[in-house]
Amino acid sequence: MKRQFWLVGIVLLAVLSACRSKSDGPTDTYSSGVISIAADESFEPIIQEEIDVFESLYPLAGIVPRYTTEVEAINLLLKDSVRLAIATRTLTEEEMNSFHSRKFFPREIKLATDGLALIVNRDNPDSLLTVRDFSRILTGEAKDWKDINPNSRLKSIQVVFDNKNSSTVRYTMDSICGGKPLATDNVSALKTNQQVIKYVAENPGAMGVIGVNWLGNRSDTTNLSFTEEIRVMAVSAEDVATPANSYKPYQAYLYYGNYPLARPIY
């Protein structure tokens, strides 16, 4: 996914060049000026990395990011508080009409493909999961680990998200649960992806749902492994998960469409 994010730099250049003050001439150019952007917090690691590279290439340019929920990122764009919003969905017809009524004509550009990662405690022996069973867990049909694996010694499944207004919650409700509401007794939301990782690392029965960008192993310069604090589950689109048909959210599996919990970034 990282390789596709060179588009972010191009988008930032385009946004900078489009910014104009009310003075006689432009105050922002392709290589100078300051803009504010908003991004879903699940993308913070990769977006911040791209901003750092961009600003090192263009020292007179400044990008002021605001990492928040997807809902808030879109709202900030609607209120003209930021020049760019990075999210996992396009604008709705109502949102687009709001812009058009004010003579604004925003562009939607697909930047990359992201993946949702399912993480569990390192003491949890379960490493495979089907999309169907993931849906059963989210809707409350499967509440204990034995409902997924009869041999499991763990008890209840505690699912934790980063934020109730995040793109991960919306994606699971729309794309995994088919619009059904999430269970309220075993599904909860914290505030950030980092808090989810910490919670899962400390609770054997927990399952975290986070953006794959937060799982990078800082000691691995090849970016081919995940953080060792937790375990990343392999997910299958088939009825029965096996090592042969289950995939972890590595870049190659996202790119070729093998990983079933993939989503676009706009």
Give names to the regions the model predicted.
Residues M1-S17:
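Sec-dependent bacterial lipoprotein signal peptides
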Residues R3, V82-L84, F104-P106, T227-E229:
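Short alpha-helix boundary/capping motifs
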Residues C19-P59, I63-R66, E70-V71, N75-L78, ...:
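Exported/periplasmic ABC-transporter solute-binding proteins
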Residues V71-R102, R218:
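Pocket-flanking alpha-helical
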Residues T90-E94, K103-P106, P125-L128, P181:
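Peptidyl-prolyl cis-trans isomerase
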Residues H100-F104, P249-A252:
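Short acidic (Asp/Glu) patches
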Residues R107-L111:
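Conserved catalytic cores of soluble enzyme domains
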